[in-house]
């Protein structure tokens, strides 16, 4: 969720071509991780999104809202515009999915086809959460392409959010995972691998693995490989490689902070990540993780070029387009398949 200046965006304005980043990547991309509302549930709208996609060479986009909204507390004179703007809490906000669905429906049919919307506006610790998913699919049967981004363990945001701590293996999510399997829908999860103060081992990774192992028919996408602000562990690429080798139903997206911190630090691709990407390119996609601010899509995606340039043609095509299209593109307008009763293992 970029809300700060990333050093790979810095350009020497005196050089020719300094406006090139505004045009996005030289490779056409499916942006597989794009929030179209902010933390106060405001959106620039569908026309602004399509315009920005065209300017940034984004052919299609996987879009979703935000499942939480920032409270404007009585003691705060200035309205917050981000979850870190002040110390006020966040609360779950189900209407975010309606905002996304109506944004899509407001566009011409040809532009709607470029968008793969996901549903995310449920409380992941509420065992009634499945009902929200079912209602939204029934209300907008021609819209959804998957579920997510489900915000689970998320450093400061976890502390700000009302209620029980969300986690990938919470019992409230198991019926949703089963629903996703029955309808062949991918599930995008934000699950930090560890806490801010535990950077020597992945404290929370077992929660993700338990869910992924319990639902082998559900396709999970591990958002930005489990990294967040101040969240890191040694040998990160080895951990990701082990996960992809062990769980064939697990995918990852390269987005937000992981790219600049470990994949391509200081704008120099790490050879270990290049090798991992070549090996598992069919399970990796790229995303901006922008929270609205569509005008920044170009620079955000442009910075991937230095990494993409060093991949084989096949791996590059998978990251830029094929993996995301395989995950999300085949599900559009197919959400009304018959649902099988969800009976997770822990209830049998």
Explain the meaning of each model-derived region.
Residues 37-45, 69-72, 90-96, 122-130, ...:
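Acidic-and-aromatic substrate-binding clefts and catalytic sites of carbohydrate-active enzymes
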Residues 30-34, 60-63, 115-120, 145-149, ...:
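Hydrophobic faces of well-ordered beta-strands that scaffold small-molecule active sites
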Residues 1-32, 41, 45-60, 64, ...:
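Mid-to-C-terminal alpha-helical segments outside catalytic/metal-binding sites
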Residues 6, 13, 108, 154, ...:
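Catalytic pocket-lining loop regions of alpha/beta-barrel enzymes
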Residues 4-22, 77-195:
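Active-site gating/metal-coordination segments in enzymes
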Residues 34-107:
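N-terminal carbohydrate-binding/catalytic regions of secreted carbohydrate-active enzymes
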Residues 17-21, 47-55, 129-142, 175-179, ...:
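Short amphipathic alpha-helices and their capping/turn segments at secondary-structure boundaries
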Residues 46-47, 86-104, 129-133, 169-173, ...:
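Well-ordered, non-membrane alpha-helical segments in soluble/globular domains
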């Amino acid at each position: 969720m970029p809300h700060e200046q990333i050093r790979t965006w810095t350009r020497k304005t005196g050089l020719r071509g300094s406006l090139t980043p505004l045009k996005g990547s030289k490779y056409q991309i499916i942006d597989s991780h794009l929030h179209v509302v902010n933390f106060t549930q405001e959106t620039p709208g569908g026309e602004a999104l399509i315009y920005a996609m065209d300017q940034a060479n984004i052919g299609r986009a996987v879009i979703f809202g935000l499942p939480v909204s920032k409270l404007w507390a009585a003691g705060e004179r200035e309205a917050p515009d981000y979850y870190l703007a002040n110390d006020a809490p966040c609360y779950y906000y189900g209407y975010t999915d309606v905002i996304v669905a109506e944004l899509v429906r407001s566009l011409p049919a040809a532009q709607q086809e470029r968008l793969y919307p996901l549903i995310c506006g449920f409380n992941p610790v509420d065992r009634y959460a499945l009902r929200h998913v079912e209602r939204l699919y029934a209300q907008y049967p021609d819209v959804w392409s998957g579920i997510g981004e489900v915000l689970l363990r998320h450093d400061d945001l976890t502390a700000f959010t009302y209620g029980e701590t969300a986690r990938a293996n919470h019992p409230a999510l198991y019926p949703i995972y089963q629903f996703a399997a029955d309808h062949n829908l991918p599930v995008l999860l934000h699950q930090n691998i560890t806490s801010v103060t535990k950077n020597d081992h992945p404290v929370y990774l077992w929660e993700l693995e338990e869910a992924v192992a319990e639902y082998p028919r559900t396709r999970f996408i591990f958002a930005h490989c489990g990294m967040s602000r101040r969240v890191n562990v040694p040998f990160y690429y080895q951990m990701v490689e082990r996960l992809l080798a062990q769980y064939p139903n697990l995918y990852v997206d390269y987005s937000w902070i992981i790219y600049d911190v470990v994949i391509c630090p200081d704008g120099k691709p790490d050879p270990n990540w290049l090798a991992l990407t070549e090996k598992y390119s069919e399970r990796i996609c790229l995303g901006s993780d922008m929270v609205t601010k569509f005008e920044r899509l170009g620079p955000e995606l442009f910075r991937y070029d230095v990494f993409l340039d060093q991949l084989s043609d096949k791996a590059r095509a998978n990251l830029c387009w094929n993996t995301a299209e395989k995950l999300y593109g085949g599900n559009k307008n197919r959400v009304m398949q018959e649902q099988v009763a969800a009976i997770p293992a822990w209830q049998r």
